[in-house]
Protein backbone atom coordinates (compact mmCIF):
# COMPACT_ATOMS: atom_id res chain seq x y z
CA UNK A 1 0.00 0.00 0.00
CA UNK A 2 1.73 3.12 -1.20
CA UNK A 3 3.39 4.79 -4.17
CA UNK A 4 6.21 3.69 -6.43
CA UNK A 5 8.30 6.51 -7.82
CA UNK A 6 8.79 5.72 -11.51
CA UNK A 7 10.59 9.02 -12.14
CA UNK A 8 11.81 11.21 -9.32
CA UNK A 9 11.53 14.54 -11.13
CA UNK A 10 14.14 17.26 -10.68
CA UNK A 11 13.85 17.64 -6.90
CA UNK A 12 11.03 15.75 -5.21
CA UNK A 13 11.19 15.46 -1.43
CA UNK A 14 8.93 14.70 1.51
CA UNK A 15 8.15 17.91 3.42
CA UNK A 16 5.95 19.26 6.20
CA UNK A 17 6.20 22.57 8.07
CA UNK A 18 9.73 21.66 9.18
CA UNK A 19 11.55 21.21 12.46
CA UNK A 20 12.03 24.14 14.77
CA UNK A 21 14.18 24.49 17.87
CA UNK A 22 17.31 22.85 16.47
CA UNK A 23 18.95 25.76 14.61
CA UNK A 24 21.40 26.34 17.48
CA UNK A 25 22.65 22.80 16.92
CA UNK A 26 23.20 23.36 13.20
CA UNK A 27 19.95 21.98 11.77
CA UNK A 28 17.96 24.17 9.41
CA UNK A 29 14.19 24.22 9.74
CA UNK A 30 13.67 22.62 6.29
CA UNK A 31 9.97 22.33 5.46
CA UNK A 32 7.85 23.39 2.51
CA UNK A 33 8.71 26.46 0.46
CA UNK A 34 5.09 27.42 -0.29
CA UNK A 35 3.19 27.17 3.01
CA UNK A 36 -0.09 28.34 1.47
CA UNK A 37 -0.19 25.59 -1.19
CA UNK A 38 0.90 23.01 1.38
CA UNK A 39 -1.89 23.93 3.77
CA UNK A 40 -4.51 23.96 1.01
CA UNK A 41 -3.39 20.48 -0.16
CA UNK A 42 -3.93 19.07 3.33
CA UNK A 43 -7.14 21.03 3.90
CA UNK A 44 -8.73 19.54 0.77
CA UNK A 45 -8.20 16.06 2.24
CA UNK A 46 -9.13 16.93 5.81
CA UNK A 47 -5.57 15.95 6.81
CA UNK A 48 -3.85 17.29 9.92
CA UNK A 49 -2.37 20.73 9.17
CA UNK A 50 1.24 19.50 9.34
CA UNK A 51 0.83 16.20 7.46
CA UNK A 52 3.78 15.40 5.17
CA UNK A 53 3.39 15.85 1.41
CA UNK A 54 5.57 15.45 -1.66
CA UNK A 55 7.07 18.76 -2.75
CA UNK A 56 8.52 18.91 -6.26
CA UNK A 57 10.47 21.60 -8.07
CA UNK A 58 10.28 22.59 -11.78
CA UNK A 59 9.76 19.02 -13.07
CA UNK A 60 7.28 16.79 -11.28
CA UNK A 61 7.62 13.08 -10.52
CA UNK A 62 5.88 10.11 -12.13
CA UNK A 63 4.09 8.01 -9.51
CA UNK A 64 2.42 4.61 -9.65
CA UNK A 65 -0.21 3.95 -6.99
CA UNK A 66 -0.09 0.46 -5.49
CA UNK A 67 -3.29 0.97 -3.50
CA UNK A 68 -6.33 3.22 -3.45
CA UNK A 69 -6.10 6.63 -1.86
CA UNK A 70 -7.35 10.17 -2.33
CA UNK A 71 -4.87 12.90 -3.27
CA UNK A 72 -4.81 16.63 -3.89
CA UNK A 73 -2.37 18.54 -6.10
CA UNK A 74 -1.60 22.20 -5.44
CA UNK A 75 1.07 24.80 -6.19
CA UNK A 76 2.26 25.83 -9.64
CA UNK A 77 0.60 24.56 -12.82
CA UNK A 78 2.53 21.45 -13.84
CA UNK A 79 -0.25 20.05 -16.09
CA UNK A 80 -0.87 16.87 -14.06
CA UNK A 81 -2.23 13.78 -15.82
CA UNK A 82 -3.67 10.53 -14.52
CA UNK A 83 -3.27 7.62 -16.93
CA UNK A 84 -2.61 10.12 -19.72
CA UNK A 85 -5.72 12.25 -19.10
CA UNK A 86 -5.64 15.78 -17.63
CA UNK A 87 -6.18 15.93 -13.86
CA UNK A 88 -7.63 18.86 -11.95
CA UNK A 89 -5.58 20.72 -9.42
CA UNK A 90 -6.92 22.05 -6.12
CA UNK A 91 -9.43 19.22 -5.83
CA UNK A 92 -9.67 15.83 -4.10
CA UNK A 93 -8.91 13.04 -6.59
CA UNK A 94 -9.61 9.35 -6.03
CA UNK A 95 -6.66 7.21 -7.16
CA UNK A 96 -7.05 3.51 -7.94
CA UNK A 97 -4.45 0.78 -7.66
CA UNK A 98 -2.30 0.89 -10.81
CA UNK A 99 -3.03 4.54 -11.66
CA UNK A 100 -0.08 6.55 -12.99
CA UNK A 101 0.27 10.24 -12.08
CA UNK A 102 2.55 12.31 -14.32
CA UNK A 103 3.45 15.98 -14.61
CA UNK A 104 4.71 18.25 -17.37
CA UNK A 105 7.18 21.04 -16.79
CA UNK A 106 6.11 24.07 -14.78
CA UNK A 107 3.80 26.38 -16.70
CA UNK A 108 3.45 28.69 -13.70
CA UNK A 109 5.25 28.64 -10.37
CA UNK A 110 8.25 26.53 -9.44
CA UNK A 111 6.89 24.12 -6.82
CA UNK A 112 4.03 21.68 -6.63
CA UNK A 113 2.55 19.62 -3.81
CA UNK A 114 0.84 16.24 -3.60
CA UNK A 115 -1.02 15.39 -0.39
CA UNK A 116 -2.29 11.89 0.40
CA UNK A 117 -5.31 10.94 2.50
CA UNK A 118 -3.50 7.73 3.54
CA UNK A 119 -0.43 9.62 4.88
CA UNK A 120 3.16 8.92 3.82
CA UNK A 121 4.97 6.41 6.02
CA UNK A 122 8.29 8.14 6.67
CA UNK A 123 9.94 8.50 10.08
CA UNK A 124 9.59 11.53 12.33
CA UNK A 125 13.06 12.95 12.99
CA UNK A 126 13.32 15.70 15.60
CA UNK A 127 9.60 16.38 15.40
CA UNK A 128 9.31 16.53 11.62
CA UNK A 129 9.02 14.33 8.54
CA UNK A 130 10.72 16.98 6.35
CA UNK A 131 13.71 16.05 4.24
CA UNK A 132 16.93 17.86 5.14
CA UNK A 133 19.28 16.93 2.30
CA UNK A 134 22.33 18.69 3.75
CA UNK A 135 22.07 16.75 7.03
CA UNK A 136 20.67 13.63 5.30
CA UNK A 137 17.79 13.25 7.75
CA UNK A 138 14.02 13.05 7.53
CA UNK A 139 11.82 12.35 4.55
CA UNK A 140 12.76 9.29 2.53
CA UNK A 141 16.27 8.28 3.63
CA UNK A 142 17.25 11.94 4.01
CA UNK A 143 17.42 12.51 0.26
CA UNK A 144 15.38 13.48 -2.78
CA UNK A 145 13.27 10.76 -4.36
CA UNK A 146 14.84 8.68 -7.10
CA UNK A 147 13.50 6.32 -9.73
CA UNK A 148 12.12 3.06 -8.27
CA UNK A 149 11.85 4.33 -4.68
CA UNK A 150 8.76 3.12 -2.83
CA UNK A 151 6.94 4.93 -0.03
CA UNK A 152 4.27 3.05 1.90
CA UNK A 153 1.17 4.64 3.37
CA UNK A 154 0.71 4.79 7.15
CA UNK A 155 -3.05 4.26 7.02
CA UNK A 156 -5.52 2.42 4.86
CA UNK A 157 -7.55 4.64 2.58
CA UNK A 158 -9.49 6.92 4.88
CA UNK A 159 -13.14 7.65 4.30
CA UNK A 160 -13.41 11.24 3.15
CA UNK A 161 -16.99 12.54 3.23
CA UNK A 162 -18.10 14.40 0.12
CA UNK A 163 -14.65 14.11 -1.46
CA UNK A 164 -16.13 14.72 -4.91
CA UNK A 165 -17.16 18.22 -3.86
CA UNK A 166 -13.82 19.08 -2.26
CA UNK A 167 -12.28 21.55 -4.68
CA UNK A 168 -11.13 25.12 -4.78
CA UNK A 169 -11.61 27.58 -7.63
CA UNK A 170 -8.19 28.29 -9.15
CA UNK A 171 -9.05 31.99 -9.38
CA UNK A 172 -9.37 31.99 -5.59
CA UNK A 173 -5.74 30.90 -5.23
CA UNK A 174 -4.22 33.10 -7.93
CA UNK A 175 -0.73 34.31 -7.13
CA UNK A 176 -0.78 37.03 -9.77
CA UNK A 177 -2.75 39.51 -7.63
CA UNK A 178 -2.12 39.92 -3.95
CA UNK A 179 -3.71 42.66 -1.87
CA UNK A 180 -2.12 43.46 1.45
CA UNK A 181 -4.16 45.60 3.82
CA UNK A 182 -2.23 48.43 5.44
CA UNK A 183 -2.94 50.91 8.17
CA UNK A 184 -2.06 54.49 7.32
Can you name each region flagged by the protein language model?
Residues 1-178:
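Conserved "landmark" site that anchors the functional core of diverse proteins
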Amino acid sequence: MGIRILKGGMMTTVQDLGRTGYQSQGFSVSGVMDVRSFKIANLLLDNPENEAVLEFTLIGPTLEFTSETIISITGGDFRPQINGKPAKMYTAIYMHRGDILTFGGARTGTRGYIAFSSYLDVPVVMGSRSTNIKCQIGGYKGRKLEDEDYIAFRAKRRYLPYYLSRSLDLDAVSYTHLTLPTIA
